[in-house]
Amino acid sequence: MGYMIKKVTIDDYDAIYELWNSTEQSRRALNPVDDSREGIARYLKRNPDTCFVAVKDGKIIGVILTGHDGRRAIVHHLCVHPDCRRMGIAGHLVSLAEEALQKEGIQKIFGLVFKDNEAANVFWEQQGYSLRTNLNYRNKSLNERIPTGE
């Protein structure tokens, strides 16, 4: 399967949003503010070199959004089109994002995965991401349009 990788630009937004909506797991992780065109534009402005898409025949088939605060990085979204999975695309995107983050001096990265997403949890374990059992993840929405989750 031939595909190319490039850095994400805001011009990719519509295709990325369509990709996210192609899977239930990605769709349920979206929120109307942070994942809006404006939210992603803001994110890319802060993280222009750590977000990548995989493109085949002019169509975006994979995306990873990673960013950092100067200390730690987080994978905010990783998605590969269902028809293009198990071909090494996700691993390739993760590897490129990790390399880009290392170039920016970041030494540690984490990601959030729904507990019931077995395939994703297995994937991240295979990528060397250990499950932290000694922490509780807590969040608070500062905008009534963003759900806090379960």
What do the PLM-derived regions correspond to, one by one?
Residues 1-11, 144-150:
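Conserved N-terminal entry element of GNAT/NAT acetyltransferase domains
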Residues 10-42:
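Conserved GNAT-fold acetyl-CoA-binding loop/helix
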Residues 41-53, 74:
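A short helix-loop-beta-strand connector motif used in the catalytic cores of GNAT acetyltransferases and
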Residues 53, 59-67, 74-79:
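Conserved beta-strand in the GNAT
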Residues 67-76, 85, 132-135:
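A conserved beta-turn-beta hairpin within the catalytic core of GNAT-like acetyltransferases
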Residues 80, 86-99, 126:
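Conserved acetyl-CoA-binding loop-helix of GNAT-fold acetyltransferases
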Residues 101-113:
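Conserved GNAT acetyl-CoA-binding A-motif
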Residues 111-120, 139:
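Conserved beta-strand-loop-alpha-helix junction that forms the acyl-donor binding cleft
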